[in-house]
Amino acid sequence: MIKKLKGRQRIQLIACNNINYVYKTEFHLGESAWKWNPTLKSFIYKEISQIHIIRIPAFLLIIGKVLNLIREVMRFRGKVVIVANNLANGKVIERLVKTMRQPALLTKYYAGGLTRKTENLRQYLEADKGLTNLKVRSKYIKQLIGLQDLERKPAYIVILDAIQGKFLINESAILGIPTIGCGDTTINFPKLNYPLIGNFKSREKRGSVLLLIKHAMFEGMRQEATIFAEYYNKYTRMYKSFLK
């Protein structure tokens, strides 16, 4: 909905369905709002509430740039996906999540099906009472971790069995998602950002995985803040130039 204002032929954006959709789906995701970047969230809300421009072409340009900004920021949010390939590794996940107590680890993907094309995928979401098993058809990793036209990529993917997870590692490399892989000396080192050799049943290995997960979370948050500042400064200047 667009409303014309008096003076200098300004146009005020009263409501924009696209931005509201992005705001509701990408910033809440069915979880509490405080779990995500409050500065970014407040900025988007401010832009939704009142946007002033002069010409319709400029309006379309600014809205397109804002949507691109949101899409880029979503890619670098500090969320970590952990992939386990068997029940023993799944128990390692539970211990790590319990130790972390971080909202960024609420979502996990589990089972060997995630690392192979032909098997069904089983997505485990942490509920109030343990884990809920949801069986879904194989959509490969791009569809699994993304939304149509608005991919929300995690900061890192932790693969607790990199030997069986070659397909997942390749897909992550194509999508530009950093990976942490655990396995023996036969794992594909070039495509892994952080390879860990040996099993992770020992306290030392679990500590290493935990440390890398924390690093991944903070790295994702750092990238999020950096790219947001870059886009914000660039398009704020462009936006103000249309008001002169």
From Swiss-Prot:
One Pfam family here: Ribosomal_S2
Listed InterPro entries: Ribosomal_uS2, Ribosomal_uS2_bac/mit/plastid, Ribosomal_uS2_flav_dom_sf
GO biological process, one term: translation
Domain of life of the source: Eukaryota
Molecular-function annotations in GO: structural constituent of ribosome
Statement: the UniProt record of this protein carries the keyword Transferase: no
Subcellular location: Mitochondrion
SUPFAM superfamilies: Ribosomal protein S2
Alphabetically ordered keywords of this record: Mitochondrion, Ribonucleoprotein, Ribosomal protein
Family per similarity comment: Belongs to the universal ribosomal protein uS2 family.
Protein name: Small ribosomal subunit protein uS2m
Organism taxonomic ancestry: Eukaryota, Amoebozoa, Evosea, Eumycetozoa, Dictyostelia
